[in-house]
Amino acid sequence: AWANELNTPVFVVKAQIHAGGRGKAGGVKITKDKAAVAGLAKELIGKTLVTHQTGPKGRQVHRLLLEEGANIGKELYLSILVDRDSGWPVFIASTEGGMEIEEVAEKTPEKIIKELIDPAVGFQGYNGRNVAFALGLNTIEPAVMNPFIQMMGNLYRLFMEKHAAMVEINPLIITKEKTIVALDGKVSFDDNALFKHADVQQMRDLNEEEPLEIEAGANNLNYVKLDGNIGCMVNGAGLAMATMDVIKLAGSEPANFLDVGGGATKETVAAGFRILLKDPNVKGIFINIFGGIVRCERIAHGVIEAAKEVKITVPLVVRLQGTNAEEGRKLLAESGLKLDVADDLWEAAQKIVKLTGKAA
């Protein structure tokens, strides 16, 4: 029925998943036959697409986009994100549209154009002209110069007003009719600023999110699922990254990033245990806590109570360091729970890797 709403000679049916590489994975179908659109839609709905960004499990298609085919003359790439060196917004552009920008940067870095934007001044016309001339739009198609510069200004406004982490158009096309069209776009938002943007939150598609990450968010935990077999529970993002690094050095792979924050109370630890144990890949759990503001004996009590509440069926290693760490380790050792206690990070990592086996 929706095909009848489009007056076009070419129909494009696109799978809507939060990953790139859909075309190569068979997630984009093109037809000139209006009657064939429904069949293509049925073929894609429910299909699992495996791309270089989905991981081996892939993502199931729950939503589709039907749009008009475009008369493509030239494909470009355009995005805006935060430059980590300067802390300023930076536009990234390339004449190699339609490709993964990481691949372009690796193989032909000279084709990557960057334009920093001073946030104290904001986007200016000269910023747009710098990028437009660097792309060669003045020779490729002068008619699109002004619309392109206006589009850059709109992207900058979207990026700043909605607290985006990245806005990407790939490909940005110049049609044979001498118009400029954003053929595909992605916007990533800063999770920490979402409370300011109810309109953005309403667009959230839980089908595209990891169920365990949704559960973690509901418990105020920072959780990212990974592909390893050792579940990590840590307080502090920096310590969490160091923990993942040392697990790799010891010969295995982390199953997640899980930051329980500064509290590490019975409730947060219990929620963390439940989330980790729902992952069938987890063969062991490594708790690595540094007691700074929160004393280690309080953390130990939280771990003990949570472990009694949640049935733990895999090896557990707990490393405590910081304020009253010795008292905390003593409480754990005398708790009667089946766990290993350590004070040294490398020793603890080696213990959990030995108990779970090295990664294949």
Mark where each language-model region is.
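ATP-dependent carboxylate/acyl-activation modules
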Residues: A1-I169, I173-I287, E297-I299, K308, ...
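Catalytic core of bacterial c-di-GMP phosphodiesterases, primarily the EAL and HD-GYP domains
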Residues: G292
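Short amphipathic alpha-helix used as the core "switch/output" element in two-component signaling
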Residues: I304-E305
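Short internal beta-strands
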Residues: T313-G322
